[in-house]
Amino acid sequence: NLEDYSIFWQVLKRDTAENLMHILFVASKLDDIDNYLDIVRQSGLNPVVVDVRCFATRNALALREDLTKSDAPVAIVEFGAFENYILILYKDSPFISDIYLSEKDRNTLMDQDSTDEQIKGISNRFSMQVSQMISSYTAKYKTGSINSLLISSSMPNLERTIGNFNEALPNVDVEVFDTLL
């Protein structure tokens, strides 16, 4: 029974000529996870189970019927101090790619006293990578255009960056995506 497992998968490569797909498939039996938790508890420790952020984001997106019912791909960007990636979902197939953000830029984004000019420069560099990844994805997988970009972040300066993302990605509707709602 599939409900007994926590499952994630991603198509890594499609070979239409050979009618083959390379797939990354990760699954954990929920009972096994519970057994390991019991062992840790018996040793006197209090374990905490955390859903990997990109999995949690994907699970939160499943609750947004306005986006998941569409035939268009949906892009979610994690813009944070520790993780930066784009997750593109199309017909239930996830595609995940890392986005580079330097340590200096991370520190600037975390600093409430950073200037609008600093934030804009970082946002523009980040947006350029997002734009390139979206273009590469739509060209490689022959999908329609991506019109909606959801940004998930724990950064204190997120509201200051949304306008910059909208400016840098004029053909995409950018909105904050709160995975906790």
What are these regions (language model features)?
Residues 1-181:
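Hydrophobic/aromatic-enriched cytosolic interaction surfaces used to assemble or bind macromolecules
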